[in-house]
Regions:
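Positively charged
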Residues: 1-194
Length: 194
């Protein structure tokens, strides 16, 4: 297995729509294993953060694959479940605003509004079709990762909301960005060429 790397903004591949996976073969299984390894490698370098999930486009692989950590509260639980060709079939419930971060958007966090409930259908890596009913943090994480498959980043949902952006300090505390115009709105490293 050749280890890939996590790509970050403004890499244009993060803005492209991913292709459906036609067949779950060794190449796809290798991509999934790379995603798991990279997620844990990233986490090991970020002591205050937990790698909850990842999408294949974050490695520059434009395939509709995501992985979600089985327990997003426990760093010791390093198991991720892969979902292939995930599709949102329904969102419901009130919209809830909460913090999100992203391996591909370094050092920036945001308060993003998302539906509280979501239904998703997908295939597991062994080819079984699954239907997921998720609420809260799992719903948020599924929506965030499926956005990646459509070339959408969490920052796109809050681009014009000055008070929605945060940075993490050296102690792991999230603090509002000080200069929205410079750090967010006019930051070419976030948005790239438009």
């Amino acid at each position: 297995m050749k280890l890939m790397k996590i790509i970050t903004t403004p890499d244009k591949r993060l803005r492209e729509k991913s292709e459906k996976v036609a067949k779950i073969d060794d190449e796809i299984l290798d991509v999934i294993e790379n995603m798991r390894k990279l997620s844990l490698d990233w986490e090991a370098k970020h002591p205050y953060e937990l790698s909850a999930a990842m999408a294949a486009p974050q490695m520059g692989v434009l395939k509709r694959i995501i992985i979600i950590r089985d327990d997003m509260e426990d760093k010791k639980n390093a198991h991720f479940t892969a979902f292939i060709n995930p599709e949102v079939t329904k969102t419901e419930g009130k919209t809830v605003t909460d913090f999100e971060g992203c391996l591909s958007v370094p050092h920036i966090y945001g308060k993003v509004p998302r539906p509280f409930k979501v239904r998703v259908k997908a295939k597991t890596e062994d080819g079984k079709e699954v239907r997921i009913k998720a609420t809260g943090e799992l719903a948020r994480t599924l929506l965030h990762e499926i956005d990646h498959l459509n070339g959408v980043l969490f920052i796109d949902h809050i681009r014009d909301k000055k008070d929605a952006f945060y940075k993490m300090d050296s102690k792991g505390e999230l603090l509002p960005v000080e200069d929205y115009e410079k750090e967010i709105k006019n930051n070419d490293k976030l948005w790239g060429e438009e």
